[in-house]
A protein has these predicted regions:
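Ser/Thr/Pro/Gly-rich, low-complexity intrinsically disordered stalk/linker tracts of secreted
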Residues: 1-146
């Protein structure tokens, strides 16, 4: 029989998927919102282009802020890369605001099961309400197949 810790049993809300406990809020006006296009069925292990558009909320993003896109480690998604525009799975990000964006992919960057993460850091300026960050997965403009 397991003994309880001095603080009692681990609360149920701390066990399992952490999504609800780490979401900063659901208010689109304050935190912004994202949309993905196109939303269509795709064949596994085929190349496509998908655009994620994030609209900044009232709180903005400062010059050290970031947004993060996470997905499950077990998937048929290719590994995103930002170094070779003609290579497979090339990813780009642009914003309508000040400064520049820096992208970082980590295969073990999130908490299970959302291990794979793409973090988009804001540098050298601020994003204000209504500014747009556009992330293109499989950007074909440099010759990538998607």
């Amino acid at each position: 029989m397991k003994k309880e810790t001095p603080f009692g049993a681990v609360p149920r809300y701390l066990v399992g998927d952490n999504g609800p406990s780490v979401v900063p809020g659901y208010d689109k006006a304050n935190f912004g919102y994202a949309s993905i296009s196109p939303i269509i069925p795709v064949e596994a292990r085929s190349f496509h282009t998908v655009t994620l558009t994030y609209t900044v909320g009232k709180l903005g993003i400062d010059d050290t802020g970031a947004i993060r896109v996470c997905w499950r480690m077990v998937s048929d998604a290719g590994r995103p890369q930002m170094d070779n525009p003609s290579g497979e799975n090339f990813v780009t990000a642009t914003s309508s605001g000040e400064g520049s964006l820096v992208l970082k992919f980590e295969q073990l960057g999130g908490q299970r099961p959302w291990n794979e993460t793409l973090t988009i850091y804001q540098r050298g300026g601020y994003l204000k309400e209504g500014d747009i960050i556009t992330i293109v997965f499989g950007d074909k403009t440099g010759g990538s197949p998607g």
